[in-house]
Amino acid sequence: THAFADAASAAAKVDELTWGQGADAALILVGTVDDEVVSAATAVIGKGGTVVITGLADPAKLTVHVSGTDLTLHEKTIKGSLFGSCNPQYDIVRLLRLYDAGQLMLDELVTTTYNLEQVNQGYQDLRDGKNIRGVIVH
């Protein structure tokens, strides 16, 4: 898994890592989704690849402008995801039990921790691409 602060960096690295074949998936995790972000994500996935959109968009604007031919000929998929398509009432309890039993390694996924006084720094680091999974500890 790789994370990028901008589309140009993502495209260059994906091309390098996949020898030009494209990524299997691109996850759009930005706060506000726009057509530029969706188009860039669609461009970096290869044949049969999937773009997953988790952010929200301005409901008054169209945010997906892609070639229907590209989708069909390369069998690409664009889908939205809310809470990872899980059932929060069931799955969160299950995940907590797995974590308590030592079967789900969440601590290793945290890239940086912040205390309450560092909240603004945490958001700035996220905007600057300095952390992927920052956690505020209270």
Can you annotate each of these PLM segments?
Residues 1-3, 78-80, 113:
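Conserved beta-strand scaffold positions in the cores of enzyme catalytic domains, especially
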Residues 1-39:
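Adenosine-nucleotide cofactor-binding segment
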Residues 9, 16, 39-43, 85-138:
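C-terminal hydrophobic helical "lid"/dimerization subdomain
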Residues 16-20, 67-69, 124:
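Short low-complexity, flexible loop/linker segments enriched in glycine and/or proline
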Residues 19-21, 44-45, 72-73, 128-129:
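A structural signal for short secondary-structure junctions
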Residues 31-103, 138:
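Glycine-rich phosphate-binding loop and adjacent beta-alpha segment
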